[in-house]
Amino acid sequence: MIGRIVSRLPDRIGTYYEPFFGGGAVFFEMARQGRFKRAVLADLNPDLMNCYSVVKERVDDLLSELRGPAYVYNKEAYLAMRAMGTASLSPVQRAARLLYLARTCFNGLYRLNLAGEFNVPFGKYENPVIVDEPALRAASEALQKATLSCADFSEVLSGIAPGDAA
């Protein structure tokens, strides 16, 4: 599916815009193929964009945090991490929390309740990969050409010019 989407985009792009970044599948494939000079990536989810910012700028700190004792795979640790508020966490801790929850929750689902709290149940996996160092380092490298923002799509696309693509 990703190949079909990417094949519809120009081969060479000045700036690639992705206003609904989410998981970033199109961006990461375009980056792998070297099809743009720079990228503007945005999403309205502040936790998600913080995570990408940390992956881009502080991947070593993130890897170190994820290897800490709080990020073990068991139901008690998961529930404690899920219940933890994010206001007092550093950007690196917030990013690690998001990655941990995504790797250990039911089906990798991201869902917030009306109070803005992550409320996905614990996922039952044999041995989930919580720290995927090669993937995080590759993502960090790809993100070096990107400007990241937590913004509305109309604001993001206002800078598009000839030779750019979204």
State where each predicted segment sits.
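SAM-dependent nucleic-acid methyltransferase catalytic core
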Residues: 1-2, 11, 56-166
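SAM cofactor-binding core of SAM-dependent methyltransferases
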Residues: 7, 12-85
